[in-house]
Each structure stands twice: as structure tokens, then as C-alpha cells.
Amino acid sequence: MVSHSELRKLFCSADAVCFDVDSTVIREEGIDELAKFCGVEAAVSEMTRRAMGGALPFKDALTQRLALIQPSRDQVQRLLAEHPPHLTPGIRELVSRLQERNVQVFLISGGFRSIVEHVAAKLNIPTTNVFANRLKFYFNGEYAGFDEMQPTAESGGKGKVIRFLKEKFHFKKIIMIGDGATDMEACPPADAFIGFGGNVIRQQVKDNAKWYITDFVELLGELEE
């Protein structure tokens, strides 16, 4: 059993930190915002809640929600232009501080790459450090499904990404930070998990995470000590 002080040391000596995006790096759930924009918010929000609570296999939840939303390429582009995602307070400073320490920062999301890349640009995170789901569109821009080959399209996908990062870059210590069950499941192979409840509290995560925070200032403080 890793103690809290050992977890803090792990975080401060990590060579890579992976963040979930929806309700962690940004305040919103991207798929819920897309559903709201497309007029099917209520049904999709309930599915998101069940998926994040671990009650529904992730790929099933994603397939069902997207079948309801049917987002076109134009709708995704207009969502980003008219309702860009809001960064969680403190995340810009935390990512910047980690990068100053030569820590590699990755975004691993069950959300959509087009939205996550927009967030990555705000945080000076290269697109090569983004792992997320890809929406597919027909030539006329209508919804054509999603890329089911992406590891993030299924339960356990975030762990697969972290395993891939360890094999590719030989990272010794990878930390996963996020609000949901799929984030907590990524440890192991992540060396430590930090639960985040600054935007929404998932009781299962709060009850089981050995380190649970509600403000990124706490992690910034650890790096400054």
C-alpha cells in the first residue's frame, strides 16, 4: 500500500503526467456540450453519468450517445467557435510548471480529438501528446461513426495508452489525473492515480482514490515545495 507521502514524492519525481480532459482539464463534458448543441442533452447526460460511474461499458455508452447526437462536421466546428471549452482554474499554471520541469504532459480522453486538440493548443501541449477518439464524417460532412480502433474508444483504453507510452518512451514514473472511473482504472499501469473533483465529484473515485484533490493549486504547491 503506497502512503500519501510516497504518492506526493511520486508526483514530484514523475517523468510523465497524463490528464483526463472532460471535467478535469476543462470544466465541461465535451460529449454533453455537443449533445446540448445538437438538441439531445437530457438523454445523453444520463448515459454519460452511467458511463462515468462505471455502470455501462465505455464503448457501448459512446456508441449509444453518438447515435443519438449524430453530430455533423459543421456542428462540431460551430460548437468550438461558439462555445469553446473552459479550462479548469489552475490547469494552465500546473501544465506550464510541469513542462518547465521537463515533465512530459499528455491528454488522454474518451472525448473527441477535434475538441481535445483545441484544448491542447491552449496549454501548449503538442498534438502528438493527445490521445482521444476520432469522429468520422461522410464527404458531405454528415456523421459516419467513430474510429473504433482508437484505444480510448473502449473500457481500459487509457491504461493501454499509458502502457504504450511506457514502452515507447521508457518512462519510469507516470501519473494519471482524472475525475472518472476510467481514469482510476488506468493505475496500474500508471504508477499513481490522483482523483480530481474540482468540477464534478464521482463518489466511486472519491471513495477509492488514495489521493483526491478538488483544486489544482494543491498540486502546484507540491511542485513548489
Swiss-Prot record:
| Residues that coordinate or bind O-phospho-L-serine | 52, 109-111, 158, 182
Its domain of life reads Eukaryota
Q: Where in the cell is it found?
A: Cytoplasm, Cytosol
The UniProt record lists the keyword Repressor: no
Binding site residues for phosphate: 53, 182
What the entry lists under InterPro entries is as follows:
HAD-like_SerB (IPR050582), HAD-like_sf (IPR036412), HAD_sf (IPR023214), PSP (IPR004469)
What family does the entry list? Answer: Belongs to the HAD-like hydrolase superfamily. SerB family.
Protein name stated in the entry: Phosphoserine phosphatase
Organism the protein comes from? Mus musculus
